[in-house]
Amino acid sequence: MRQINQTQVTEFLLLGLSDGPHTEQLLFIVLLGVYLVTVLGNLLLISLVHVDSQLHTPMYFFLCNLSLADLCFSTNIVPQALVHLLSRKKVIAFTLCAARLLFFLIFGCTQCALLAVMSYDRYVAICNPLRYPNIMTWKVCVQLATGSWTSGILVSVVDTTFILRLPYRGSNSIAHFFCEAPALLILASTDTHASEMAIFLMGVVILLIPVFLILVSYGRIIVTVVKMKSTVGSLKAFSTCGSHLMVVILFYGSAIITYMTPKSSKQQEKSVSVFYAIVTPMLNPLIYSLRNKDVKAALRKVATRNFP
C-alpha cells in the first residue's frame, strides 16, 4: 500500500454530478439541451454580427469575442461530462485533465478581461459620445481584444503550472465533474499553500481588478445618465448597459465565490461550477439578443431574407 501511495497518479476518477443511474440519464438530457442551446445561440450571435453591417461596431466586435470564449469554454467541459454521464468508468488521463484545466482557465480568464473591456466601451460611448469614434478605433479594439486573450493565457499558464507541479501520489478521485483547480488541489500529496496563494493572486489580477474597473465605469455611467435631460436617452443608455451588467453579475459572482472565498462544501462548489461553467455560457447570447433591438432587427432581416 505504501508503494502504491508513492506512485504518481496517471489518471483521475471524476465522481461526477450524481451516482444514481436514473439521475444521470436525466442530467444527460438536461446538459445536452443546455449545450445545444449554448452552441446554437453563440454561433447565431457571431453569424449575425458577421453578416449584418449595422452590427459592425466595437460593442458587437467585443461581443463576438465573448461569444467565442463562451463557446470554447462550454465545449471544453460539457461534451466530456456528457460522455461520463453515460459511462460506468468516469476516468480521465492526467495529461488530458491538465489540458482541459488549462483551456478551461484560458477561456474563463479571457471572459473576465473581455467583460471589463466591454464596460470600458460602454463608458466611452455614454460618457464621451462625441469622442467615441476617435477613441474606440478598430486598431484600439483589436489591441483590447488581443490583450484580453493574452492576459487570459498568461494567468492560466501561471495557475496551471502551480497546480501541476504538485505531486499527486494518493487518491485519484476528484469530487467534481471536470478538472477544476480547487478540486485538484485537495488531492495533492504535499502542502498546497504556495499554489493556493499563487491562484489567489492571479484571481486578484483577473477577477478583482476587472470588477473594480467595471464598477468605476458603471459609476461614471450612472452619474452621466442621471444628468441627462432626455428620458429617452437615459432609458436607451440603461438598456444598452443592462445586458452587460446582468452577464457581469452572473459570471463574476459565481467565479469569485469559487476562487476568492474560503473553501465551501464539495456539493456547493459543484453547484456553483455548474452555474458559471454550463449555465452562464448559455444565458449570455440569450440575454444579449432578447434585450437588444439591433440584434433582434438583424435576426428578423436574416429570417425575412431566407424565409420570405
Curated annotation (Swiss-Prot):
The keyword Transmembrane helix applies. SUPFAM superfamilies: Family A G protein-coupled receptor-like. Gene3D superfamilies: Rhodopsin 7-helix transmembrane proteins. Glycans are attached at N5. InterPro entries: GPCR_Rhodpsn (IPR000276), GPCR_Rhodpsn_7TM (IPR017452), Olfact_rcpt (IPR000725). Residues 50-57, 121-139, 220-236, 291-308 are cytoplasmic. Signal peptide: none annotated. Disulfide bonds: none annotated. CDD domains: 7tmA_OR2D-like (cd15428). GO terms for biological process: detection of chemical stimulus involved in sensory perception of smell; sensory perception of smell. It is found in: Cell membrane. The chain crosses the membrane at residues 26-49, 58-79, 101-120, 140-158, 196-219, 237-259, 271-290. One of its GO terms (molecular function) is olfactory receptor activity. Odorant receptor. This is Olfactory receptor 2D2. The gene is OR2D2.
